[in-house]
From Swiss-Prot:
The lineage of its organism: Eukaryota, Metazoa, Chordata, Craniata, Vertebrata. InterPro entries: GSKIP, GSKIP_dom, GSKIP_dom_sf. Gene3D superfamilies: Hypothetical protein (hspc210). This is GSK3B-interacting protein. Residues 41-45 are annotated as: Required for PRKAR2A interaction.
Amino acid sequence: METDCNPMELSGVSGFEEEAELNGFEGTDMKDMRLEAEAVVNDVLFAVNTMFVSKTLRCADDVAYINVETRERNRYCLELTEAGLRVVGYAFDQVDDHLQTPYHETVYSLLDTLSPAYREAFGNALLQRLEALKREGQS
């Protein structure tokens, strides 16, 4: 089937530039929360039993979910948003909408409240790093 096409009619068909501006995507500063969540996991993986971004719960530009098992073998589902991190469930991939837990600005603060073993592992890692820097400075 052939159709006649007037090039003048196509000028506004795309509208991508205008649409992008209207949706706030021009020069986008939006964070991809999945990438943020991956960075969170990589930062503290050494101090927990297991930690990974949920593949079951849907991540979006404004929210991601992280599953973590502490060294005490307690499991949590964490929500990561612009507001911070908070516990939303006490099992992997579980979100309890009725759970009202505080937001933490950092994963360090959150894990510090949940896991004494995390606190110890983090402190030990920090001490080892400081000792290594001291040795490097003496060389």
